[in-house]
């Protein structure tokens, strides 16, 4: 028998989490949101870093998934703002990019990204990353 703490975070009866998806591409936002919602996460979406920062100020967010390159405030700027914030500094941030440049991942690591994924990302890779990060946050909280 599986206890609630042994169940995958996104499964029915599990604690889940509220995830903020940030991407300027509406199709990408919709696809990522759908993957997460099917796994029973509460998903909010923003079109850029500025909008995401407003959402972070207004709601409890457990994890942020952000595109690296966006107009207005890009994912790297959002990551820096989150890491410098006393309130949000511990929120896991997953950086997404369409580029395969190794330097993109190195830069995200240097700025404090919790994980770095390359688009297109599979549902399995996304959900495994999210569950690992949320479980780590729950343990350290």
Give the positions of each predicted feature.
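Charged docking surfaces used in two-component/phosphorelay signaling
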Residues: 30-38
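Short hydrophobic/Thr-rich beta-strand motif most characteristic of the beta2 strand and flanking loop
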Residues: 40-47, 55
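Active-site beta3 strand of CheY-like receiver
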Residues: 59-65
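Receiver (REC) domain active-site loop signature in two-component systems and cognate sites
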Residues: 70
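Short, glycine/charged-rich "phosphate-handling" switch motifs in NTP-dependent
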Residues: 114
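C-terminal output helix
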Residues: 121-131
């Amino acid at each position: 028998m599986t206890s609630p703490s042994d169940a995958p975070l996104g499964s029915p009866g599990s604690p889940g989490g509220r995830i903020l998806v940030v991407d300027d591409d509406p199709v990408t936002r919709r696809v990522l949101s759908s993957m997460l919602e099917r796994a029973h996460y509460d998903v909010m979406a923003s079109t850029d870093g500025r909008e995401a920062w407003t959402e972070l100020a207004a709601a409890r967010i457990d994890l942020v998934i952000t595109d690296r390159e966006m107009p207005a405030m890009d994912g790297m700027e959002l990551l820096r703002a989150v890491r410098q914030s006393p309130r949000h500094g511990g929120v896991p941030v997953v950086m997404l990019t369409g580029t395969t440049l190794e330097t993109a991942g190195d830069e995200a690591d240097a700025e404090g990204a919790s994980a770095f994924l390359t688009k297109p990302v599979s549902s399995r890779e996304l959900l495994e990353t999210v569950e690992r990060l949320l479980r780590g946050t729950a343990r350290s909280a």
